[in-house]
Structure formats: structure tokens, C-alpha cells
Design a protein with these regions (language model features):
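Single conserved hydrophobic/aromatic residue that forms the stacking wall/gate
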Residues: 1-12, 160-161
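Flexible ATP-lid and adjacent glycine-rich G1/G2 motifs of the Bergerat
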Residues: 40, 88-147
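Conserved ATP-binding N-box helix of the HATPase_c
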Residues: 46-67, 131-136
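A conserved short beta-strand within the histidine kinase catalytic ATPase domain
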Residues: 69-75
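Short beta-strand-loop-beta element adjacent to the nucleotide/active-site pocket used for signaling
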Residues: 76-82
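Acidic ATP/Mg2+-coordinating residue in the GHKL
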Residues: 85
């Protein structure tokens, strides 16, 4: 029989090297797509409920802040849900740093949003800065319809496999 220390030594010898070149940096929404469970707890029906809750939290934040008084949820099909409110709408003007519409920044960049300080919302629910971008990352298709500043904006985002 083999001793424990020599067995452990054999395992160690068989392992390949582990160096800085093995360290990955995931960007954009890639971390969510690779490890959805880290963000929504899994990939089962409860995870889908979590995604719905993230969108609903945004509508409820508008209600609690006094900017909306109506939220509608519609089950369109087994895997499609519509959530709407009469709140302010996601900003669509260009973000000062990224030079693209703020809605695009919010939908495609983790840790972006208007809830980190108390300037926009005194209280808020959900995963601040990751909620709606996680929903986008894990949705086959996500359509935003935003009525803001007397204009109507529509943007459809689709899951693309490269």
C-alpha cells in the first residue's frame, strides 16, 4: 500500500502548472452567461422567477420613489413575461463617459445604474447595478419600450452565441 504523503505527492506531480496565464478576466456580460448561478441562484424555474423579480424591482422602485403609480405584469407565454410601469423610464440620453445611450450602458454593463447613491432612490430593491443587465444577459430576447421626454424609444436585445 501507498502512504498518504506519497499519494498526495503523486497527485501534485500530475497536476499541470498554474500560473498567471491561467487567470481569466471575463468582461461585459460574459461572467453572467458562464456562471448564471452566481447571479440568480441557478438555471431552473426559480432562477426565471428571480429574473422577473429583478425587472419588477425596478418598477417598484419607481412606485416607492413616487414617480409611478401603476405596474402591470403580463404572462405572455411559458417563457415570456411583460412588465410595464408609468414611471420615468430608463434614461436614453448619451452617457457622458461611454458616449452611448445610458439605456445601452445599463443593459450591457454590469455594475452600472442609478441606485448606488441616494440621489435617485432613497430605497431600492434588487441587485443594484447588475439586475437588469443580468436579465438581458440570460434572455433570448429582451425588448425595451421607453416613453420619456415626450418621445418613444424601442430597443431589442438578443442573446447572440459567438
Amino acid at each position: 500500500t501507498q502512504s498518504r504523503s506519497s499519494a498526495a505527492s503523486d497527485v501534485y506531480k500530475r497536476q499541470r502548472s498554474y500560473t498567471a496565464k491561467d487567470i481569466e478576466v471575463l468582461e461585459g456580460l460574459e461572467p453572467v452567461r458562464k456562471r448564471p448561478g452566481m447571479y440568480i441562484g441557478g438555471t431552473d424555474i426559480m432562477a426565471m422567477h428571480h429574473l422577473v423579480s429583478e425587472v419588477l424591482d425596478n418598477s417598484m422602485d419607481e412606485v416607492v420613489a413616487g414617480f409611478a403609480n401603476k405596474v402591470e405584469i403580463k404572462l405572455v407565454s411559458q417563457d415570456t413575461i411583460e412588465i410595464s410601469d408609468n414611471g420615468r423610464g430608463i434614461p436614453v440620453d448619451k452617457h457622458p463617459k461611454f458616449k452611448i445611450p445610458a439605456v445601452e450602458v445599463i443593459m450591457t454593463t454590469l455594475h452600472s445604474g442609478g441606485k448606488f447613491s441616494k440621489n435617485n432612490y432613497k430605497t431600492s430593491g434588487g441587485l443594484h447595478g447588475v439586475g437588469i443587465s443580468v436579465v438581458n444577459a440570460l434572455s433570448k430576447k429582451l425588448t425595451l419600450e421607453i416613453a420619456r421626454d415626450k418621445k418613444y424609444f424601442v430597443q431589442t436585445l438578443s442573446l447572440i452565441h459567438i
